[in-house]
Amino acid sequence: VSLDDNIEKGETLVGLSVIDNPVVYIIFRDKLKKDTKEALSSLRDLNVNKIIMLTGDNEKTASRIAKEAGIDKYYSSLSPQDKLNIITSASDDDRPIAMVGDGINDTPCLANADIGIAMQSGNDGAISEVSDIIILNDSIDSIVLAKKISINTLKIGRQAVLIGITTCIILMIVATFGVLPAIIGAICQEGIDLISILWALRAHKQVK
């Protein structure tokens, strides 16, 4: 097998030479984490419409990884500034942009995306300061979990507001016609506020 075949497969070659004479070649192959493809599929089920990979890897490697993972689109051989330009351009769209990064070079992109998600190394330095979400591991499944938590929290928050507004309107109507004494109405209002708060606390329930 020639070295060109390895390059065509998207593998990275490192050569060791002695006095300009090649002695050995080391072949590196980026491998997908076992949960990657399933996690990306789960994100699509949660209405993540498009998944794009921005990488500094060469075209062949990027193409192979994107194909194996089922990524919609990819950009290869990018510098940090190139990535930032793409994020900035994509932000002109009406849809929110989430950026996932795991290195200090991703800091500008995380800062400029609508939602910056730092993974593993995001608990150190500048990257943690600009990120909206910090995931303390390198599992893509954790991004799916974060998405589920955000959906659940928003849903419960809306329900709590709806409960409060609806019951307040009912109390106002009842009080207007003198059916309910003012002091009883005030007590009911406090009770409704407490119910709304307790309802909102359901967001602490573990999402799976």
Language model segments and positions:
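Short loop/turn motifs at secondary-structure junctions and domain boundaries
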Residues: D5-E8
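Residue-level signature of transmembrane alpha-helix interfaces in integral membrane proteins
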Residues: I86, I184, L194, Q206-K208
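Hydrophobic transmembrane alpha-helical segments of multi-pass transport and channel proteins
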Residues: T166, E190-L201
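A cytosolic-side transmembrane-helix exit/cap motif
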Residues: L136, R202-K208
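Conserved ATP-binding TGD loop and adjacent catalytic N/P-domain core of P-type ATPases
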Residues: G10-Q159, T167, I197
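ATP-binding catalytic core of ATPases
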Residues: V1-L3
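Bilayer-spanning, highly hydrophobic alpha-helical transmembrane segments
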Residues: R158-E190
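Structural signal for membrane-spanning alpha-helices in multi-pass inner-membrane proteins
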Residues: L171-T176, I197-A203
